[in-house]
Design a protein with these regions (language model features):
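Buried hydrophobic core positions in alpha-solenoid tandem helical repeats
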Residues: 1, 39-44, 72-80, 116-118, ...
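Repeat-mediated protein-protein interaction surfaces in helical alpha-solenoids
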Residues: 2-10
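Structural detector for internal amphipathic alpha-helices that build alpha-solenoid repeat scaffolds
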Residues: 9-31, 42-45, 53-66, 87-110, ...
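Sec/Tat-exported extracytoplasmic proteins
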Residues: 28, 32-35, 44-48, 80-84, ...
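Flexible loop/turn segments at the boundaries of HEAT repeats in alpha-solenoid HEAT proteins
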Residues: 36, 65-72, 113, 143-148, ...
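Short, flexible helix-coil linker/hinge segments at the edges of structured domains or between repeats
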Residues: 70-93
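Long, ordered, amphipathic alpha-helical scaffolds
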Residues: 151, 157-249
Length: 249
């Protein structure tokens, strides 16, 4: 689901576990003994939904920081690769299983799963996995752009939200990446190509590019800000569209 790209990854609620089983895992972790650690490890060997792995990751890292992390990440990757579709009628924590698992990989900047996430990014029916997209952007940064460029031109993707999400992921790096800057200019050109003669100017196609130019403006380094300002000037000069230029002022 492409919308998941725009959402935060789900978080565990350790104060109020969503199920009795999660509550029992929490109590076991609270005991904190060697036997409790062994019990949690046995649970990790045969985990339930993604949320259980998320609870176990926190518990085991609290009890023995780093000791079981390799195993946690291996199991997380295995579950994500084989995760079946979750029916809509399931509990909320079960429907969010994929989000919980990806949140673990993002937390530890795990790069091992990158190739698999690239394969899972676009489903056979053309739908976009928003969690996979978010993972790729967060762990790779601007290095994700070549992967995302392939998604931009993937003819299987026809949904407007999915197309927007992929562009947004690339344009996070406007002013930092020459590839992102080039795609920004292409996006502006495509927006102008969509205008209808004699109709009111449609700003919709420019939302993603305008948002990229202004994103987190106050926290960017001076070099990035200067490059963004230059991009705005390039847009004015290259396309020379009165309405667009006025909107860029």
């Amino acid at each position: 689901m492409a919308w998941n790209y725009f959402r935060s990854y789900p978080r565990t609620d350790r104060a109020f576990p969503a199920t009795l089983r999660l509550g029992l895992l929490e109590v076991t972790a609270f005991i904190g003994s060697e036997e409790a650690e062994k019990l949690l490890l046995r649970e990790l060997d045969a985990p339930g939904p993604g949320v259980e792995v998320a609870y176990l990751e926190i518990a085991l890292q609290d009890m023995a920081p780093g000791k079981h992390l390799k195993k946690i990440l291996e199991i997380t990757r295995e579950l994500l690769e084989k995760l079946p579709p979750i029916p809509a009628g399931e509990f909320s924590v079960d429907r969010q299983a994929k989000g919980y698992l990806y949140s673990i990989l993002v937390k530890y900047r795990d790069l091992v799963f990158v190739k698999t996430a690239e394969r899972l990014l676009v489903n056979p029916d053309g739908s976009l996995d928003g969690y996979a997209l978010s993972y790729l952007r967060r762990v790779l940064g601007a290095d994700a752009i070549p992967i995302l460029q392939r998604a931009i031109v993937d003819n299987r993707i026809t949904d407007g939200v999915a197309k927007y999400a992929v562009r947004d992921a690339v344009l996070h790096y406007v002013g930092q990446s020459a590839q992102a800057d080039k795609i920004l200019m292409q996006t502006v050109q495509e927006g102008l190509d969509q205008q209808k003669e004699g109709r009111e100017f449609n700003w919709g196609p420019f939302k993603v590019s305008n948002s990229a130019l202004m994103r987190d403006f106050q926290n960017q380094p001076n070099e990035t800000l200067l490059k963004r300002r230059q991009l705005i000037q390039n847009i004015r000069e290259e396309f020379n569209h009165p309405t667009l230029n006025q909107g860029l002022n």
